[in-house]
């Protein structure tokens, strides 16, 4: 089965399931669905940053400070976060990612999904999926901040990261 054929839950403004559809149709019709974002850090606290491959269905060739993806039909956010983190980082046996917050991403142009944000400590080395990741590295928070204005980032990941920073600043 191709990624476009994967069945996703369609959800309403309250994150309640109202139907299912293939991923390709979900994207083409701008149907609200669910996604997870996992901020992966190494033992030194550096953040895993990567550039998506040019073949990705959404936001190809852009940089991201999260690993993650869509939540499959019937899958919990927590299970999806662990599955996606292990798949994209190419590691197994990760601890269950810690949930941080959830928000509704909506770019106003037909891309909208409930987004659950997590964090996890990741042992090295990582072996990212070549189908998903064109480049990767671990950056300090300062290095990441320096690149926010110069690299082209996935807009949903950037929205999640801005909320994460705002939450830290409010503490």
Model-found features: residue ranges?
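Short helix-to-loop capping/linker segments positioned immediately adjacent to catalytic or ligand/cofactor-binding
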Residues: 15, 92, 103-107
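Short, structured loop/turn "capping" segments at alpha-beta junctions
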Residues: 91-98
């Amino acid at each position: 089965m191709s990624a476009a054929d994967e069945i996703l839950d369609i959800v309403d403004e309250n994150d309640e399931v109202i139907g299912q559809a293939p991923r390709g149709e979900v994207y083409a019709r701008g149907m609200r669905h669910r996604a997870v974002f996992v901020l992966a850090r190494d033992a030194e606290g550096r953040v895993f940053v990567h550039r998506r491959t040019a073949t990705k269905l959404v936001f190809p060739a852009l940089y991201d400070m999260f690993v993650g993806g869509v939540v499959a039909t019937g899958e919990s956010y927590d299970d999806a976060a662990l599955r996606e983190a292990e798949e994209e980082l190419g590691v197994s046996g990760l601890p269950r990612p810690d949930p941080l917050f959830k928000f509704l991403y909506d770019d106003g142009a037909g891309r909208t999904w409930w987004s659950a944000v997590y964090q996890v400590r990741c042992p090295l080395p990582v072996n990212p999926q070549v189908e998903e990741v064109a480049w990767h590295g671990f950056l300090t928070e300062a290095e990441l901040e320096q690149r926010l204005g110069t690299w082209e980032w996935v807009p949903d990941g950037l929205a999640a990261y801005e909320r994460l920073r705002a939450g830290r600043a409010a503490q």
